[in-house]
Amino acid sequence: MIVIIPVSPINSLKTRLSEFLSEEERKYLLLNMLKDIKSALINLDTVVVSRDEEILNFAKKELNAKTIKEREKGLNNAIKQAFEEINQEEILIIPADIPLIKKHHIEDIINLSNHYDMIIAPSRGGGTNLLYLKSKNLIDLKYEGFSFLKHLKEAENKNLKYYIYDSFLVSVDINTPEDLGEIFIHGEKTHTKEYLKSLGIYVEPKHSSAGRFVVKRRD
């Protein structure tokens, strides 16, 4: 099994965080999230796919990952290119923004892979935050939009034996200031939390219909 992590260029990263974090801060947020993800991957070989040279260099030096320079725009195209350039058939696709994933999640996937053709974990917004394929061409990739349901439909249409891996920690992807709050609650001892704390970011509880907490930043 090999892990593929597709990563967007730094200048397009996490624009919904732009009012809360500068472009430079968003870059280092990403790099710290990648470190947390890599620490969960046990000894699995990892490939990072990106158009961004800085990300590719970081992946080589800091993550000990193989790298692929993305040729065409689009998440599906990037992953398909990785499929073409790697020899392994068993694939685990993980996004770059799920820093709460842990070793035991990966161990679960490895164990489940003995029994299923496809394993999929949804994001909170209906996307796909983890996708295992017994063979890399089992389904047509349908990332973007509500990809979780699209991938399930692909599996059903092809009569694949699949498993829905329903994990809150894996479902948390970081796109908005509110998402950062989950890092403070659930991300103890992560690189991501330590980085956010170094920026003066903190969380206050908020018991109302408007949410569980408020994410703030010290002046």
Curated annotation (Swiss-Prot):
One of its GO terms (molecular function) is phospholactate guanylyltransferase activity. Its EC number is 2.7.7.68. It catalyses: (2S)-2-phospholactate + GTP + H(+) = (2S)-lactyl-2-diphospho-5'-guanosine + diphosphate. Keywords: GTP-binding, Nucleotide-binding, Nucleotidyltransferase, Transferase. It comes from the Archaea. One of its GO terms (biological process) is F420-0 metabolic process. It is an enzyme of class 2 (transferase). Pathway: Cofactor biosynthesis; coenzyme F420 biosynthesis. Pfam families: CofC. Guanylyltransferase that catalyzes the activation of (2S)-2-phospholactate (2-PL) as (2S)-lactyl-2-diphospho-5'-guanosine, via the condensation of 2-PL with GTP. It is involved in the biosynthesis of coenzyme F420, a hydride carrier cofactor. Homodimer. Belongs to the CofC family. This is 2-phospho-L-lactate guanylyltransferase.
